């Protein structure tokens, strides 16, 4: 069934946002809707269009106190085959089981609606609150992420903008809303390795140098290496080869080079420079003719127990009756950019079981629970 007009304010807004087909990096006026609501609530608005990406920064309050920022993204991933969806992915239907169905329901238009409604209610209830409530919203999280949160954070840093705490609305929950929050993420370091040999005929190997044979022992050593032991907050650093390419397509030609693409997901126990040096040492030990192009997607970050994590955890407990688990598992998020400001960052959002899948859906009532958790967190930190 379609969403009726008597839905809660959070669900009404979530449905409105989902019905806007904002496939990355297109915003489809989602931010226009959000800024209109925030402006009406008394927020100062600062749109930031950077290249082809829409972003905005909004604040309510004073500059002489702590800043709690809600961060998120209006862009969604492509739908995939439409014929595999039970309904149009941008219809925002609530089915007979009470599930809100649509692209972005979990990732992360539901969170956007919940944080906005919570903030509206908070500034109405506490117009003279401490510090500031802020929003940092982008339409470039699911794509390259060059001109979104990263670029906005650089602008905020350049003018010494204060940002003490940040709640990112990523879908952190696994089974029940609030059962897991992310208090950090591993770093991501990618690499493209080229091992050079000498092309030749397979019948005359003495006249060639086979880069596959040369590289195989080194790749095996890299895959078997224990990079670190992790710590109380992070698992050990992982190394994975994702692509391996060599050969001309002919069966009688020894290739001239081999290209391997690999990735580290690394903990705070390792550094970029340390990992790069250890890779170089292994490759040199095997006497390879090699070159690596490195690509750092983000450094690891960690928010240890403190004001933000305590406020979020106690709010989840008071609203749901459940203890939450703090975790650093999963991929990267825009939290990695915000953490560079020295900000305490926690990710809290809906259940993530169907994110990026066809028939993405969440329990509709979870968004009202999430709204209350966000509201209680605001009260604990800024009232």
UniProtKB/Swiss-Prot annotation:
Function: Catalyzes the hydrolysis of N-succinyl-L,L-diaminopimelic acid (SDAP), forming succinate and LL-2,6-diaminopimelate (DAP), an intermediate involved in the bacterial biosynthesis of lysine and meso-diaminopimelic acid, an essential component of bacterial cell walls.
Cofactor(s) demanded: Zn(2+); Co(2+)
CDD domains (UniProt xref): M20_DapE_proteobac (cd03891)
Membership in a protein family: Belongs to the peptidase M20A family. DapE subfamily.
Binding site for Zn(2+) 2: 107, 142, 356
Positions annotated to bind Zn(2+) 1: 73, 107, 170
List of catalytic residues: 75, 141
Residues spanning the signal sequence: none
Subunit text: Homodimer.
GO molecular function, one term: zinc ion binding
InterPro entries assigned to the protein according to its UniProt record, in alphabetical order: ArgE/DapE_CS (IPR001261), Bact_exopeptidase_dim_dom (IPR036264), DapE_proteobac (IPR005941), Peptidase_M20 (IPR002933), Peptidase_M20_dimer (IPR011650), Peptidase_M20A (IPR050072)
Matching SUPFAM superfamilies: Bacterial exopeptidase dimerisation domain (SSF55031), Zn-dependent exopeptidases (SSF53187)
Name of the featured protein: Succinyl-diaminopimelate desuccinylase
């Amino acid at each position: 069934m379609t969403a009726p007009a008597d839905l809660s304010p959070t669900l009404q807004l979530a449905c409105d946002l989902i019905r806007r087909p904002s496939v990355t990096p297109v915003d489809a006026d989602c931010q226009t809707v959000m800024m209109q609501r925030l402006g009406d609530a008394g927020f100062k608005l600062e749109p930031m269009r950077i290249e082809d990406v829409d972003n905005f920064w909004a604040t309510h309050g004073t500059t002489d106190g702590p800043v709690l920022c809600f961060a998120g993204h209006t862009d969604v991933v492509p739908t995939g085959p439409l014929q595999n969806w039970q309904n149009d992915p941008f219809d925002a239907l609530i089915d007979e089981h009470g599930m809100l169905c649509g692209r972005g329901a979990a990732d992360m238009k539901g969170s956007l609606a919940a944080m906005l409604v919570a903030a509206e209610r908070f500034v109405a209830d506490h117009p003279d609150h401490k510090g500031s409530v802020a929003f940092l919203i982008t339409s470039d999280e699911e794509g390259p992420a060059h001109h979104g949160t990263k670029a906005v954070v650089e602008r905020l840093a350049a003018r010494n903008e204060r940002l003490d705490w940040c709640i990112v609305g990523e879908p952190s929950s696994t089974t029940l809303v609030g059962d897991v929050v992310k208090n950090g993420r591993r770093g991501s370091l990618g690499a493209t390795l080229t091992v050079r040999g000498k092309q030749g005929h397979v019948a005359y190997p003495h006249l060639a140098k086979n880069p596959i044979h040369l590289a195989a022992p080194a790749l095996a050593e890299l895959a078997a290496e224990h990079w670190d032991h992790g710590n109380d907050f992070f698992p050990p650093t992982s190394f994975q080869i994702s692509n391996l390419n060599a050969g001309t397509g002919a069966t009688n030609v020894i290739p001239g080079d081999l290209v391997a693409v690999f990735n580290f997901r690394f903990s705070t126990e390792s550094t970029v420079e340390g990992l790069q040096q250890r890779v170089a040492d292994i490759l040199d030990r095997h006497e390879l003719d090699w070159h690596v192009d490195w690509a750092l997607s983000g450094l690891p970050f960690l928010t240890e127990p403190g004001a933000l994590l305590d406020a979020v955890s106690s709010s989840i407990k008071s609203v749901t009756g459940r203890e939450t688990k703090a975790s650093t598992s999963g991929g990267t998020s825009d939290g990695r950019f915000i953490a560079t400001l020295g900000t305490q960052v926690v990710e809290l959002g809906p259940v993530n079981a169907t994110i990026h899948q066809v028939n993405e859906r969440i329990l509709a009532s979870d968004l009202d629970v999430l709204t209350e958790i966000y509201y209680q967190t605001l009260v604990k930190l800024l009232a």
